[in-house]
Amino acid sequence: MNTVLIVEDNEKNMKLARDVLQAKGYRTLEAVTGEEGVKLATENKPDLVLMDIQLPGINGIEAFRQIRGNAATKAIPVVALTASVTPTDRSAITAAGFDAFLGKPINLKEFLETVKRLIEKK
């Protein structure tokens, strides 16, 4: 069973992602801060991380950099999730090197296709 770490501080968004992923047979781990996301990624080495960008504490981009900077977690695919889709935000996400970008509200078909594609690619 593949494991997906969801790093999201919005309870409704967390529940939606968790419910959709679990219904498709994925195991989920949950973090509500960037620091907690980095810790869970390091301890559990999930198959994929879904990373909100606007988080309390360190933001999603900094959490992503810490995950990529650790030899034990650098190969884990990370998807940026954000409601902020301005050109400046998109270019910051692209420049950081995320494996994919999904806007909110989540398009369920695109969400599941992205998760499946990145886990299979891994």
Stretches with model-predicted labels:
Residues 52, 82:
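Active-site residues of response regulator receiver
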